[in-house]
Design a protein with these regions (language model features):
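Fold-level signature of zinc-dependent metallopeptidase catalytic domains
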Residues: 85, 90-125, 204-207, 248
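Non-catalytic C-terminal accessory/binding modules of secreted extracellular proteins
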Residues: 33-46, 51, 111-118, 123, ...
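Loop/turn elements at helix/coil->beta-strand transitions in domains of secreted/extracellular proteins
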Residues: 95-99, 236-242, 373, 448-452
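Active-site recognition of the HExxH zinc-binding catalytic motif
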Residues: 347-361, 455
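N-terminal zymogen propeptides
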Residues: 28-86
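A domain-level signal for the mature, folded cores of soluble proteins
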Residues: 189-207, 334-339, 343, 356-443
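Active-site-proximal segments of metallohydrolase catalytic domains
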Residues: 68-92, 146-316
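Sec-dependent N-terminal signal peptides of Gram-positive bacterial secreted proteins and lipoproteins
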Residues: 2-27
Length: 611
């Protein structure tokens, strides 16, 4: 999820006003208003490419469009210690149906820089459902082939590897994939000049298709209705998610305003806010209706197919690269900025479908920090690559983080408890582990199980081969901190769990003792990586990860181990105090020759606590 569109606080209030029925594999925001079963919310975008983010830092332009009011999340509680706000996990195992629609614009009206014609549809079936994907046999991509280029980097394989074989993506149709043509072209859906806007202008803009995204999805569903039996995918009368692949590239490559930015959203909200972007007035007010009346009308006219509701969707591009040559620093198009076209890769696809399964973004969508950086599919990890070259961006994304694996029911972590004594545990590389031997979990005593640390062994093998982007030494034990009280706010109030300051001089200040009561006091991530070198590069927006983040042979982590420690993030005692001693120790770390890691995990409360 990336760019939140700029709305007024009133718009944000509307965005959080609806409640949502949790159907299928979808988990979305909800709140106290019960007048509608639908969620009027803002889109969730994939992270910008590392190249675009780095260029923004170097040249000083803002890559985000996040509204500060996004942080308004009324949890209704203050607490001086960890709360009891657990995340509601949502298992995603077994056969998971994925309804895929390939969308092409009206012939002769394609996006700037697009290919001549479409990539044959079978390649997207391979990329999403297959076990092999070889776009390099096509003439347009042949130059990027080579002996070290993997051909097994599919969404199916990514989910299989991260879930330890528990999740299988499938489709109900036995027909071949085919492109569905829209009734209008790119010049309409992505128009920048106001040609198709009311009164010849967009009040708030059609950047990345803001004003017409809802129409794009609505028109696509109507065009595909004769080819798809939507009822086959429905659960409790609603299709959980539509997976849209659109012709052209994505704005996440360049910030090009005339391209869609890959995201997860719902049709109702896209239509509602589309009219807002065009006219400055949301759709219900524009049409002189109450919100309930407008929702009922839209459900009947745009969201009902084969007797079921179709609302939630995610959208991603058919090709990669800055094919139009948009220069984000100047706001102009130039030949020197052109990259690609590159074949579509699994990273963005798998990331966006993670949202469909209920996962939040674990990067900072305001681009003030990096969140968990390259260490999760739900953050910058969706852009990892092998070989380490631009044309392979996203072809070898990092595994889903261990919290996400727990959330989706993919793993049963080894739980070490205070009474267990010293546990000497050998962890295989996370890509070679089983579902019950790859992750160690240690809860902070007194936290009601909502605050805990997780440890995993990450090596450059399997999909994690893409970590070569951080150099050959980027491997070892990765330590995570989880605060479910904060992640819970994603489910209950739409709060972005990693859009906060998290580094040392912020994390233990006085306002750490309360959370989300007025929307401004959350001062640590819901999910964070404890970087072994203690530099807090992720929090300080220095990089998305480096070799210094991994714990290696001879390292240790304790409640008082310098700048990086397992001290609780709660129980603040005042300025100058150390954080509460959780007792959590990981010592005697050894990276073995076979890639496994052996370490001692134990509790020793108050041992060696700094005064």
């Amino acid at each position: 999820m990336f760019l939140l569109k700029v709305l007024s606080k009133a718009g944000i209030t509307l965005a959080l006003a609806g409640s949502v029925v949790l159907t299928g594999f979808q988990l979305d925001e909800s709140s106290s208003v019960e007048t509608s079963k639908y969620d009027l919310s803002l889109a969730k975008y994939v992270a910008a490419t590392p190249e675009l983010a780095d260029k923004a830092k170097e040249l000083g332009f803002d890559v985000s469009k996040v509204d500060p009011a996004e942080k308004i999340a009324n949890n209704g509680k203050k607490f001086q210690q960890p709360g009891d706000n657990h995340v509601a996990y949502k298992e995603a195992t077994g056969d998971i149906p994925v309804l895929v629609i390939l969308a092409k614009y009206k012939d002769g009206d394609e996006p700037i820089g697009d290919l001549d014609g479409q990539v044959p549809a079978k390649y997207y079936e391979d990329l999403i459902f297959g076990t092999e994907y070889n776009p390099y046999e096509l003439d347009v991509f042949k130059e990027y082939d080579g002996p070290n280029v993997p051909k097994d980097r599919t969404m199916q394989n990514a989910y299989q590897e991260s879930s330890y074989g528990k999740t299988h993506l499938m489709r109900h149709e036995n027909t071949e994939f085919a492109w569905v043509e829209l009734p209008k072209g790119a010049s309409y859906y992505l128009d920048q000049e106001g040609t198709y806007a009311e009164n010849g202008r967009y009040v708030l803009g059609n950047v990345n298709g803001d004003a017409h995204t809802g129409e794009f999805v609505r028109d696509l569903l109507k065009a595909a209705d004769d080819q798809i039996d939507f009822s086959k995918y429905a659960e409790n009368g609603e299709v959980p998610n539509i997976f849209i692949v659109h012709e052209g590239t994505g704005a996440e490559w360049s910030r090009d305003p005339a391209q869609f930015w890959s995201h997860k959203w719902n049709l109702l909200s896209a239509l509602y806010y589309g009219k807002y972007y065009e006219t400055g007035i949301p759709a219900d007010v524009y049409e002189g209706m109450s919100q309930d009346e407008w929702i009922a009308k839209t459900e009947d006219e745009a969201m009902t197919y084969d007797g079921v509701i179709v609302n939630n969707y995610n959208i991603q591009p058919a090709i990669g690269g800055n094919v139009a040559g948009f220069n984000a620093a100047t706001g102009e198009y130039d030949e020197a900025s052109v990259t690609g076209p590159y074949p579509a890769q699994v990273g963005v696809y798998a990331h966006e479908f993670g949202h469909a399964l209920g996962l939040p973004d674990f990067y900072d969508t305001a681009y003030n920090s990096e969140g968990v950086g390259n260490y999760s599919m739900m953050a910058g990890g969706s852009w990892m690559r092998y070989p380490d070259a631009l044309q392979y961006n996203g072809n070898s994304p990092t595994h889903f983080d261990p919290f996400s694996k727990i959330f989706l029911g993919w793993v049963n972590p080894i739980e070490v408890k205070p009474d267990d004594g010293v546990q000497k545990i050998t962890l295989p590389s996370i890509d070679q582990a089983d579902d019950d031997n790859g992750i160690v979990k240690m809860a902070v005593p007194g936290s009601n199980g909502t605050e805990y640390f997780i440890f995993e062994n990450v090596q450059q093998s399997g999909f994690n081969q893409g970590l070569i982007r951080q150099g050959g030494d980027a491997h070892g034990l990765v330590a995570w901190h989880v605060d479910e009280n904060i992640i819970n706010l994603y489910q209950t109030a739409g709060f972005r769990p990693n859009n906060v300051a998290n580094w040392m001089n912020k994390r233990f200040q006085h306002n750490q003792s309360q959370t989300a009561s007025d929307g401004t006091v959350v001062t640590h991530y819901g999910l964070s990586v404890l970087q072994a070198d203690g530099k807090y590069d992720l929090e300080k927006y220095v990089n998305r990860g480096d070799a210094g983040d991994f714990f290696k042979s001879g390292d240790k982590i304790t409640p008082v181990s310098g700048n990086v420690h397992t001290g609780s993030y709660y129980f603040w005692k005042g300025y100058g105090s150390t954080p509460a001693d959780s007792g959590i120790h990981v010592t005697d770390i050894v990276e073995n020759e076979d890639g496994s890691i052996t370490a001692k995990f134990y509790y020793s409360t108050n041992e060696g606590k700094k005064k």
